[in-house]
């Protein structure tokens, strides 16, 4: 039985990694070992940051809602609590959008939240 060497698979794997490393600076786009390390690191960063993105946006929305709520005489927690008590179930993304783009509508929500005590 003939000895099988993995040249075809190895070449394909190397090409795949080097293709992913296209655009990297210097040896990281030319040499397989360095390209492989750089690609693995970048994929790891991408994986982690897809999760961090969700946390970051939630923090941004909360900061915007808090700022708008304080303009209307409420804290963030009292505003959210008042909305829940009055049965208004808007998510933080929508509330933050209202706070930025439609201050009048947000002010009405704030009044509703104040009245729900």
UniProtKB/Swiss-Prot annotation:
Identify the keywords attached in UniProt to this record, alphabetized: Ribonucleoprotein, Ribosomal protein, RNA-binding, rRNA-binding
Recorded coiled-coil stretches: none
InterPro entries assigned to the protein according to its UniProt record, in alphabetical order: Ribosomal_bL20, RIBOSOMAL_L20_CS, Ribosomal_protein_bL20_C
Q: Name any one GO molecular function.
A: structural constituent of ribosome
Q: Which Pfam families match?
A: Ribosomal_L20
Which SUPFAM superfamilies does this one have?
A: Ribosomal protein L20 (SSF74731)
Among PROSITE patterns, the record links this protein to: RIBOSOMAL_L20
Q: GO CC terms on record?
A: ribonucleoprotein complex; ribosome
Name its GO BP terms in alphabetical order: ribosomal large subunit assembly; translation
Which CDD domains does the record match to this protein? Ribosomal_L20
Q: Does the keyword NAD apply?
A: no
Q: Which family does it belong to?
A: Belongs to the bacterial ribosomal protein bL20 family.
What this protein is reported to do is described as: Binds directly to 23S ribosomal RNA and is necessary for the in vitro assembly process of the 50S ribosomal subunit. It is not involved in the protein synthesizing functions of that subunit.
This protein is called: Large ribosomal subunit protein bL20
